[in-house]
Amino acid sequence: MKRMLINAKTVALVDGQRLYDLDIESGAREQKKANIYKGRITRIEPSLEAAFVDFGSERHGFLPLKEISREYFKKAPEGRVNIKDVLSEGQEVIVQVEKEERGNKGAALTTFISLAGRYLVLMPNNPRAGGISRRIEGEERNELREALNGLVAPADMGLIVRTAGLGRSSEEMQWDLDYLLQL
């Protein structure tokens, strides 16, 4: 039987009596997930369709092609996109950590920035993204969609209504959006 044992700073995954994964949070190692950094491309690896980014951590982060926003594309993509046509070594990029460093692997990075607020998630460089949390269904979903349509948001940004947005007025959501836009 697989189980997950969680303590304040330790997570252990066990199968029967066998430990198969252990993650210990140490006070010396700060969490980087969701942090946003200005990084520099150090190496482009066409075979992996990815780039390695120096963002200030001891290991360089991994940035796959699918996680690169269209704002970094020099020209509109025609057919299959080659990462060398999108990025160049030494180029500066704004990245967000999606997955922490683990073992000998660097952090997984994205250029699709997301800023989580109390009721909304703002995606400043992803205008096509947005909607309602997947956990919300039925009539509540329709009500939130109407509230979302009533928000005054920049056209080049995406928004997602979080589960905490349930039962909130358009004014409360607009306040949250205005706060996120100031960041």
Describe the role of every protein-language-model region.
Residues 1-183:
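Single-stranded RNA-binding surfaces
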